[in-house]
Amino acid sequence: MASKKTGHPWAFRARFRANAFGWKSQPAITRVREAVAEIKKVAKSDPIVAADGAVLFLERVSPALAHVDSSSGAIGSAVNRAIEELVAVIAAAPADVKTREAWLERLYEARAADEIPYIELLGDLWGELCVTKEIASRWADREIGITRHALSPDPQMRGHYHGTMACLASLYRAERYAELVELLEPEKFWHYKRWAVKALAAMGKKAEALRLAESSRGPWTHEGDVARLCEEVLLSSGLVDEAFTRYAADANRAGTYLATFRAVAKKYPTKAPEEVLERLVASTPGDDGKWFAAAKDAGLLDAAIALAKKTPTDPRTLARAARDHVAKEPDFAIEAGLVALDWIAQGYGYEITSADVWAAYAPAKEAADRLGTGVEFRARVRSIIASYTRGEAFVGHVLRGQLGDA
């Protein structure tokens, strides 16, 4: 079916009907990704048509997903990623003011009708959607009256208003910073207060911005977001060392320890890998071993082994590291295998079986044989087994007949 606005036959349109998806999230996630890909492909040749398609998708996505199970957060994350990509498409389109205002009206209505809500993020990105300061200022004027009531410290007046975030984002894009700070002066909710922090920083009052952000910490505050905003303020001031020391770890926390290390190392290219690792390890007391993969990936093999020995480390991760380094770093392979056996002997690891014992032992033994230290290696394995009652019962049983000196 063709879009009524542009005549383009969007494939996603038929798929994103009201209540189109059942409770399973994966089919919906796949369709969301396909729709974004379809729109971005068109954007290469016709950015106006693509932007109109992006608006159409954002109008239809929430009603289509009404029955999808969102408890895991997967579908919400997929939609948020789609919103970020499509906002960029809309913002980049060389549209005239009338066309852009029409898009904004459509998105505003979609956001107002968003019951789940799936497209709530649009409010945060309203400044980007406005593109120009003039359009943003008109939206700020339109929304600021109700927003003042919604943000009132008087509980009799205060309430939720779907246009609040659009108002704050519009004020910021319009560079009406002082007005934004004044509006949010009594505000406690961080999701709103962060705009005052951004405004103060934009006004050059960066020390004041940092103080406001730090004073906003609390049980209902997103600590990672506070750290990211503070880090951004310091980096924009050229205070790299202070940003690194105070905020790098919390601001760049990712889904895995390895991903976190890579994010920090990428953002701070002047910092040596050893320094990045030290800062991150210090930020997670008691979790030293979980940084093993990050240290290994950075080529800090001695540090990786030291971390793995300090606190429990996944034996399978250690065994894979031993396997992968037999030829190029046999000393490391030996140590990784031995540490894996040690943690298994102590009872660590999820549903460990005899296969996991062999996975740790075999590459380490091969590496030792390559170096001519097989006798010493077997002695160290026997020492591990003898140190723990459970280890003697399990690891020793699995490796029975393998540890003679002959």
Locations of regions flagged by a protein language model:
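Eukaryote-biased, non-catalytic alpha-solenoid scaffold regions
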Residues: 1-406
